[in-house]
């Protein structure tokens, strides 16, 4: 009875409990029931326990909701993990030297990289992309084309990976800054190394042929008759491509369609590096001032004329400027492919000043003095080597110390005098460095090369100063120079100023004497050179042009690429590019590029790296894998193409495997023939060749005499034979059928179109004008009325006025045939037609056009038609 009575009560209680009710208070209910728990009646005990359980459950639900609320509002425990994410997000900020670019609908990573003159890999690195896929509206960081890297961006770092200077700089910051925790210093320094401005490092450029697997070279494309265009040559294991600069004057004038070319690597038959161009036509179009390879390359070579002493002084003054002014230039030149490897720079660094000395200078706070120390140390080392009068060791050290002090005082007083003194000192030291033992150890052919040797040494000295300058110290020097101009002078005492002034005067008088002697020597050399080379009043112009020619050969080499078929143009459609390749199939496929001298070794190493083995492992068969083989001199074929001058001008050449074996076979055959001729041995091949030649001469005339359905009133038999040799192969063997003739069908263009109905062969139109001249055109399709031009590259025009001449398709455009009810035209471009006829077939006109590159076919541009014949091949 107790259970039956209590069970409905429990159900009623459980139904009345509402957790979400606003007036429900489980604590109050529990407080009311607690005194009843001590009462003796047993039947009420289950009800009290149930109420207590309900109260306990209701207390758990609010705590669960609070945990959810705490989870979504982030408490201190969750902030630790999310702080890491936020820090990671905040660390990816906009890199220096970049701008934001919003991806458009038709953009891809390759097209964006091409638009901003970079590579897809660099965009992936800059934006930390996980794939190469981009979506419309995505914001990417791209290199800013107008950004000029400052001194703070190190020229020895690349955006791809932090190099050894970065890590050493980070370690250096750890040791010199004890207040900064090491774990905080390392990521910040590494981040600045990974995300600098878009600067190509010297080391990464040296290694890009082996790590990046492509070469990107600023060069000039030397065309045949269309000028010389600057651009970028991209060499990969699969393709070779030249992309012209859009700011080039010829590109702006003619468009980039003429100059953008590419070809697969397997089409390259040979790649050779020459000291000079062998093709006379291309050599004539080569500008003399090609030494200006790009806007930044070799920016000071243009100033050199050789015999002008003032220009020599200005060049050496430029080379002797302080590092604060030359640091931005070194950064720019690292962009323009000036390459110095770490192995090349390390002996210079050891010779100039040790890293311990630099660290000591930097840790003492004299960053400006350390920068001056690098320049002055080089000055001192060169001066000590070249000095004929011995300088004591203590004087050298005092002089070095004093010049450093002079460098720190130059911002306070007597600024102009001190700057002039430092420049003059550096001019003198440059002269001394050249006139010392280095001049004796370097092989100089005659006195005429002394001026060029002086220029090379000054350039190399300037480059070594720029490359050896630690970027961190240069940046710190620039900052302290701009901020603490007044403080540096106050730090020096009066005694050091007096000592520095005395030593500066002593040093100036000593070096100016040697400067004067060196100037006199240079003037004597230039006068001797002028006497030998100048024979007229224009001698100065000739000598300067000759010096420019020497500079060009010294600064550039010429890359010649010979390919199996013409390179495809990249800025035209696929159909147009294919048709242009077909049009140029009979031409010589050579492409010349002016390449900086320091990049020639990179090209050679790149071609050699991707060369396969000559033979397979087990069998004696040749491998079909594409690659290149170095051509040795004993393996070169003595053909007409390979003259002695060409062999002398060529530095190296690599050829494809197929070309290599072709040359070997040609060499063996030629040597065998030469031996037989010398021994007067008649071979079976000679006998057969003579017999075949006579048989061919007899058969040629018969094979090129087609059968005509009607006798021609305009063409003679020999003219028919000449025309037959140039007809498309699909017409050979078919008889000639006269489908239209003015004497048979009348003079009407509409009648001409009607006679063409149902034909499916090329047609040959022969015209005779009132002057008795015979000319015409071959149409690849039957003539018809069309809305636009039609036809293929088989179309050509010809003339027998005064001699037989055929003008085939040049590939410039595809304006082959155009038919209207009122006119018929062949060729086009520039508003002119190669051949134009009116609707009455009475009046005609001929003019040169781009489609065929023809001259005027008739004797006069305007002519009157006397007779027309049209032949089909069926």
UniProtKB/Swiss-Prot annotation:
May be involved in protection from oxidative damage. Its main location: mitochondrion. Residues 551-578 are annotated as: Mediates oxidative antimutator activity. Residues 151-169 have a biased composition (Low complexity). The keyword DNA damage does not apply. Residues 64-89, 347-362, 452-466 have a biased composition (Basic and acidic residues). Residues 99-142 form the LysM domain. It is linked to Cerebellar hypoplasia/atrophy, epilepsy, and global developmental delay: An autosomal recessive neurodevelopmental disorder characterized by infantile onset of hypotonia, global developmental delay, delayed walking, and severely impaired intellectual development with profound speech delay. Patients manifest cerebellar atrophy and childhood-onset epilepsy. Residues 713-874 form the TLDc domain. The keyword Lyase does not apply. Pfam families: LysM, TLD. Induction: By heat shock and oxidative stress. It comes from the Eukaryota. Keywords: Disease variant, Epilepsy, Intellectual disability, Mitochondrion, Phosphoprotein, Stress response. Belongs to the OXR1 family. Signal peptide: none annotated. InterPro entries: LysM_dom, LysM_dom_sf, TLDc_dom. The modification Phosphothreonine is found at residues 119, 341. This is Oxidation resistance protein 1. One of its GO terms (biological process) is negative regulation of cellular response to oxidative stress. GO terms for molecular function: oxidoreductase activity. It is found in: Mitochondrion. Residues 363-391, 510-527 have a biased composition (Polar residues). One of its GO terms (cellular component) is nucleolus. Residues 208-275 form the GRAM domain. Residues 1-89, 151-194, 299-406, 431-537 are annotated as: Disordered.
